[in-house]
Each structure stands twice: as structure tokens, then as C-alpha cells.
Design a protein with these regions (language model features):
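Beta-propeller blade termini
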Residues: 14-21, 64-73, 112-121, 163-172, ...
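Extracellular beta-propeller repeat domains
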Residues: 2-4, 24, 38, 183, ...
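Inter-blade boundary loops/turns of WD-repeat beta-propellers
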Residues: 21, 34, 44-46, 71, ...
Length: 234
């Protein structure tokens, strides 16, 4: 790699996502800052650098994690932010890196990790949310309606206190399944998509004392998804 480029962010940046927020064909950045509870937007300069814009978003109190996707199918990318107190905030994009005011979606536990996928194959993005801490624990799917709103589902049990969530096709059926981590059980949990808007928890398997982050990829080139898991305490 070339020398690093340092860009000024807010206080305690904890999450960064890439997306084309100004629709010029280049990936931009959105950075979630935990301490000052803001999101900063950085436009791609097209020369290996990013320019911090004057756009500052305020999703709400105690943001935890963030993803991007086009939730209302208008060709403009949006943001979804998990909040500590049983909410996911949806910020619909208006173009040119600007967003509408956040709209809350209540979930049944304390949300930690969040992923985006089309779990029912209807060409509308859905959201998977890991729930841990206070309230109920497990994984909850927010089914996309197509206009930026979502329908909640029952909690998928299993996996203890999930802190990480990722999409994975474990059975090669073309549908995204899920894998979550649990520091309480020191394990990873596979959750199979039944292709009818329900999921089945398959099994837990050991993955170190404190599995915190997971990456899914085909590392062996055999057409099957593999996992790489980080453990900060091992």
C-alpha cells in the first residue's frame, strides 16, 4: 500500500461505510462518530483522496453501527443506523450527499450489528439486526416494503448475545443466510434462510474467547463460503 491518508472525523469514529452518495459513479464515505453522535459525509475526489463535506447528520442518541442501501428504490443511497435504545434509524438520501430527517424503527432488543440483504428475493432490500444486551436477544429481520419503510419479524433465537452479523450462503441455494457471533458463548452461530421469510438456527461452533468481527469470503476457491473471525482477547 501507499502511505496512509489521514482525514479529520468527529469524536470517536466507530464505523465507516462506502456508497456513492452523490451519484457520480465514485464511492464516497460515511463515518459514524460515537461520542458526538454524528455522521460525516466525505466525497471521493477521484484521485485516491476524500473531501470532508459540510454535511453533518444527527441520527439520534448513542449510535452503534451503520449500513447503506437504496431502501426506497429511487436510485439514491440511504443509511440505516442502530441505536442503543431499541431503535434503528432510517435516513433516506435526497441526493448530493444530503439526507432526510431520521425515521425510527423500533426493534425488540438492544441492536448491535446490522446488515443489508434481499432475504426473500423480491428485489427489495431488507435489514438484519443483531440484538444483545437489554431486552430480547437474537436476530430480527426488518422486511423492506420498497418505500423506505419496513415490517418487523419475530426474533430468531440462538447465538447468545450476538455482536456481529454477516450474510453467508451456507447451502449454495442462492439465498442469503446469516452468521452471528456471541462473546457470551465464545462461538459463531449459523442461521439458515428457509426461503419463506423464516429462518432456522442450525448450529454453534467454537471460534475463540471473544469473537468480535467476521468476514465472509471463498478463501479456498472451491465455491463455498468461508469465515475469518477476529478475537481481540486471544
Amino acid at each position: 500500500f501507499k502511505s496512509q491518508i489521514i482525514m479529520k472525523a468527529g469524536e470517536d469514529p466507530i464505523c465507516v461505510v462506502t456508497s456513492d452518495f452523490n451519484n457520480n459513479g465514485y464511492l464516497d464515505l460515511a463515518v459514524l462518530n460515537y461520542r458526538d453522535q454524528t455522521i460525516n459525509i466525505y466525497f471521493n475526489s477521484r484521485f485516491g483522496n476524500f473531501k470532508k463535506t459540510g454535511i453533518t447528520l444527527r441520527p439520534g442518541k448513542i449510535p452503534i453501527n451503520m449500513v447503506s442501501g437504496d431502501f426506497n428504490r429511487d436510485g439514491i443511497n440511504d443509511l440505516a443506523v442502530t441505536m442503543r435504545y431499541h431503535k434503528v434509524m432510517i435516513l433516506l438520501g435526497k441526493g448530493k450527499g444530503r439526507f432526510k430527517n431520521p425515521v425510527p424503527i423500533k426493534v425488540k432488543g438492544q441492536p448491535t450489528a446490522i446488515v443489508v440483504g434481499d432475504y426473500d428475493k423480491n428485489k427489495i432490500l431488507d435489514i438484519g439486526v443483531a440484538l444483545a444486551g437489554s431486552g430480547k436477544t437474537g436476530v430480527q429481520i426488518l422486511w423492506g416494503v420498497g418505500d423506505g419503510t419496513f415490517e418487523s419479524s419475530n426474533i430468531i433465537k440462538g447465538g447468545g448475545q450476538p455482536l456481529t452479523l454477516a450474510n453467508i450462503d451456507v447451502d449454495n441455494d442462492g439465498y442469503d443466510d446469516l452468521v452471528s457471533s456471541s462473546n457470551a458463548l465464545h462461538s459463531m452461530t449459523l442461521i439458515r434462510n428457509n426461503r419463506n421469510k423464516t429462518f432456522t438456527t442450525l448450529k454453534d461452533f467454537a471460534s475463540g474467547s471473544f469473537p468480535k468481527f467476521v468476514v465472509v469470503a471463498d478463501f479456498t476457491g472451491d465455491g463455498r463460503a468461508d469465515l475469518a473471525v477476529s478475537n481481540p482477547t486471544d
